[in-house]
């Protein structure tokens, strides 16, 4: 990463499956990059960005082998995590769906331009759509775990309390 930043002026690094890396490894990489200076290296390392897919799954799930670089475990590091909550709310579908076209998202016609594949009742589709609107609202607020919003059904919840596939939707302490 140092080589790419110094010699090719790459200013951001995205990690696929970042959750399969130890959080300490990612923090060391961030620290090493931050040591680069304009005078010495031709790049301001403090301005370089690291982010990735902070998914919690597979053989390392739930910190089985090490503390993972996952959503909610990178607070205060300056390392970002991809927002799958916002993606799924807008695009539709989810990571465990057999056919991602069935559950339409906020931006793909859910409740306004139905594709005919979703066989749920209108009430269930409406509730899902409105929940996706709540996920979009939270995403626009930086997916902050402490952000408070009023959900479609009138409840006041924090981002951490808003459901996303059985876990809290809000995972960030800063946007």
Regions found by a protein language model. Name each.
Residues 30-32, 45-175:
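Conserved alpha/beta catalytic core and glycan-binding cleft of carbohydrate-active enzymes
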Residues 1-60:
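Active-site neighborhood of glycoside hydrolase catalytic domains
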């Amino acid at each position: 990463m140092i080589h790419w930043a110094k010699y090719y002026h790459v200013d951001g690094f995205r990690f696929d499956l970042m959750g399969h890396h130890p959080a300490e490894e990612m923090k060391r990489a961030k620290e090493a990059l931050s040591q680069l200076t304009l005078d010495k290296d031709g790049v301001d390392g403090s301005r370089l960005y690291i982010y990735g897919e902070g998914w919690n799954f597979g053989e390392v799930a739930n910190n089985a082998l090490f503390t993972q670089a996952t959503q909610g475990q990178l607070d205060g590091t300056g390392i970002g995590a991809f927002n799958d909550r916002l993606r799924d709310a807008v695009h539709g579908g989810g990571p465990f769906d057999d056919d991602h076209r069935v559950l339409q998202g906020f931006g793909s016609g859910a409740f306004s331009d139905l594709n005919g594949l979703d066989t749920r009742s209108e009430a269930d589709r409406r509730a899902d759509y409105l929940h996706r609107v709540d996920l979009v609202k939270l995403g626009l607020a930086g997916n902050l775990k402490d952000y408070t919003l009023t959900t479609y059904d009138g409840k006041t919840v924090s981002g951490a309390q808003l459901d996303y596939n059985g876990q809290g939707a809000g995972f960030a302490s800063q946007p």
